[in-house]
Amino acid sequence: MKTDLLASRHIGINEQDTTVMLRKIGVDSLDELIEKTIPANIRLKEPLALNAPLTEYEFGKHIAELAGKNKLYTTYIGMGWYNTITPAVIQRNVFENPVWYTSYTPYQTEVSQGRLEALMNFQTAICDLTAMPLANCSLLDEATAAAEAVSMMYALRSRAQQKAGANVVFVDENIFPQTLAVMTTRAVPQGIELRVGKYKEFEPSQEVFACVLQYPNSNGSVEDYTEFTEKAHAADCKVAVAADILSLALLTPPGEWGADRKSTRLNSSH
């Protein structure tokens, strides 16, 4: 294969190709094409007033100056939103290391090799922290993950549960409100009922096919759900947990007390 042929496929069309394409659609130039397709009232008649280009160092300094205008305050929102720090080793070796998004390979041109490795590292870390055998490559947020867990558990109902029409999910009352809201939005169209209550008063029944717990809960309390999980499993009821992933570096991971599904929250770094 000639090098110029390979290059032309990646560099794009040349002047001759452009001329052929313009003739095909009935115009003589790109300017005429723009005149006929872009309304005159939104076209800029004078050249863009762009500043002179910056080097990478100059641009980084400029962005840092702009960011310095922001005022960062301590947040007391809670409910999953906490102040965090970014260790220098993470910032340098992950966020500021271009190898994670520039290492392309000939056979995987649409995804960088660095991103694939980062996703594998992420999944490995999630499995280690949660003590779960599998992990996906994350969703939008904890609330979305919890809603997906409910949908998954609904689809995985046993034949007996499907025959009995089991459509109730027990949700502990100390779940984060935003998580409950998204779960409700996703559950209603599927005919799933979310029943909120105290987990210590939960009693399994034929209509309940799954449970969702918060760990730690909205009050900041760290509960031991081992006995609850055993009771649920005895009734063929699956258990999903919405947990703070960072807390699992110290707390007993859900996988060790029998959770079936796990949705986690990764806090933003400041």
Residue ranges and their predicted role:
Residues K36-N121, C127:
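N-terminal entrance/gating region of PLP-dependent enzymes' catalytic architecture
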Residues N41, I63-K71, Q123, C127-L134, ...:
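Structural signal for hydrophobic packing residues in well-ordered secondary-structure cores
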